[in-house]
Amino acid sequence: MVRLYNTLTKKKELFIPIDKDHVKMYVCGPTVYDTAHIGNARSVVVYDVLFQLLKFCYGKVTYVRNITDIDDKIINAASEKNSNIESITTYYIKAFHDDMESINCKKPTYEPKATENVDYIIKLIEHLLQSGHAYESDKHVYFNIESYHEYGALSGKKTDELVPGSRVEVNENKKHPGDFVLWKPANDIDYKLSSYWNSPWGEGRPGWHIECSAMSYAYLGKDFDIHGGGIDLQFPHHENEIAQSKSAFAGSMFAKYWMHNGFLTVNEEKMSKSLFNIVKVRDLLDSGIKGEVIRYALLKTHYRKPLDWTENVISDAQETLNKFYRLSRGLDTINIDESNAEISKDFIDALKNDLNIPEALAILHEMAAKINKMSNESEKLKLTESFVKSARFIGLLESSYQEWFTAGVSHQEIERLIDLRRAAKQNKDYNTADKIRDQLKQIGVTISDNEDGTTTW
């Protein structure tokens, strides 16, 4: 049985799908105006593992992760770069996909774009207007939070606490400071960049919050099982989604379970442009850090806890994965998913316990220690196959032993070093021969000298 912490009820609950034969989940995806940083990646990695677990336990799972491809930040990026919206979003959508693939994230079932669902958005706004939960003011359409009496159930914030400030837009056209925009009129930049649509309220574009309500409804219906995202989205974004969707569909629960992954800091400081400490996934990859190392580092801390990103986090992940890969030597790891090897039950049980990935990783370490002590080759092989298959379940050990340790090093270069070592030995320069052996070992190449004078690796 899967148990998940539900942010809405503030407790860990037994997960009971609305339809036991079809689990539905929605996760807020990227706003594509820049490349992904590690905070973005953490959310993707967490819900990627959840997706795999739910498929394992329940079979059919529909996972929707949206793309926000119209937003003030995107418009500003296009304007600053003297480009157009489509060029900006196309470029960053591809960059996002490339980066997430590099850290072994599988694709969701659907990945709708906001711009492709404007018709749904307009219909939802019309419905909210007709039911008295929204109003027009100065060519804008706003949601009336006082019309929804359960506002604040997710975040704990009440309507009388919402005063104009950093997270509440100051606007005298609103009935209440906490009212949020569903539709905004086009301005000069919108017309210049063609970032507007026709609507019953004039030319304009949707607000951010209504986009997710419309897309989740379009792909999952009015009720679904899990809504996920980063803790930074809990308020106001997710709170506003609930208000919109439950107001639009009387009797709807919208999302039954709400999940939020924790904040990510860098050296105990919040990531921000002003501190120049934003860590991009692409920069890490370009520096030579493997995607799987990034993934392990993001998984090591429980998803609900804050994660502090340091150099030690990366070095520990690299060291651990090197150890894990050494155990896989000689196995056909790429095709092991089709083998008869079983995923560790303890490993799966850890994941079923509110996606306790750190506990699952600890079980992998226990399996590794046991493998190293085993002398029975048959039993050792069986446990090693289970170890690798378990690790692959959460997106680790996706490469072969040789690919992992020789990435970026050609076979020709390895053979050249072996030839140099052989020549050094023939000249009785054993110091150089040992240095070359150590050099090969550092890149994961273990060599054996044969009686006939040849060397294998």
UniProtKB/Swiss-Prot annotation:
InterPro entries the record matches = Cys-tRNA-ligase, Cys-tRNA-synt_Ia_DALR, Cys-tRNA/MSH_ligase, CysS_C, Rossmann-like_a/b/a_fold, tRNA-synt_1_cat_dom, tRNAsynth_Ia_anticodon-bd
Q: Please give the NCBIfam families that the UniProt record associates with this protein.
A: cysS (TIGR00435)
Organism field: Wolbachia sp. subsp. Drosophila simulans (strain wRi)
- The yes or no answer to whether the keyword Aminoacyl-tRNA synthetase is present is yes
**In the UniProt record, which is one GO cellular component term?**
cytosol
Chief location category: cytoplasm
Known EC number: 6.1.1.16
Cofactor binding summary note: Binds 1 zinc ion per subunit.
Catalytic activity annotation: tRNA(Cys) + L-cysteine + ATP = L-cysteinyl-tRNA(Cys) + AMP + diphosphate
Q: Could you say which residues bind Zn(2+) here?
A: 28, 212, 237, 241
Q: Which gene encodes it?
A: cysS
Renumbered to this chain, motif 'KMSKS' region spans 270-274
Q: Which family does it belong to?
A: Belongs to the class-I aminoacyl-tRNA synthetase family.
Q: Which residues form a coiled coil?
A: none
Q: Which GO terms describe its biological process?
A: cysteinyl-tRNA aminoacylation
Localisation: Cytoplasm
Report the cofactors.
Zn(2+)
**Keywords of this entry:** Aminoacyl-tRNA synthetase, ATP-binding, Cytoplasm, Ligase, Metal-binding, Nucleotide-binding, Protein biosynthesis, Zinc
Q: Self-association or partners: how does it assemble?
A: Monomer.
Q: Write out the GO MF terms.
A: ATP binding; cysteine-tRNA ligase activity; zinc ion binding
Q: Motif 'HIGH' region in this chain: where?
A: 30-40
Q: Where does ATP bind?
A: 273
Q: What is this protein called?
A: Cysteine--tRNA ligase
